[in-house]
Curated annotation (Swiss-Prot):
Upper lineage: Eukaryota, Viridiplantae, Streptophyta, Embryophyta, Tracheophyta
Gene Ontology terms: biological process: defense response to Gram-negative bacterium; defense response to Gram-positive bacterium; negative regulation of cell population proliferation; negative regulation of translation
Subunit structure: The mature protein consists of a small and a large chain linked by disulfide bonds.
Record keyword Protein biosynthesis present: no
Keywords: Antibiotic, Antimicrobial, Cleavage on pair of basic residues, Disulfide bond, Protein synthesis inhibitor
Role description: Inhibits cell-free protein synthesis. Inhibits trypsin and chymotrypsin. Does not inhibit ribonuclease of protease activity. Has antibacterial activity against Gram-negative bacterium P.fluorescens, and the Gram-positive bacteria B.subtilis, B.cereus, B.megaterium and M.phlei. No antibacterial activity against the Gram-positive bacterium S.aureus or the Gram-negative bacteria E.coli, E.aerogenes, P.aeruginosa and P.vulgaris. Inhibits the proliferation of leukemia cells in vitro.
Family from the record: Belongs to the 2S seed storage albumins family.
MF term (GO), any: serine-type endopeptidase inhibitor activity
Protein name per its UniProtKB record: Napin-like polypeptide
Amino acid sequence: PAQPFRIKKRQGPFERP
């Protein structure tokens, strides 16, 4: 995927609101 950190909020140590 292009944004593996935007698929689910709070999915890791990078909580990005």
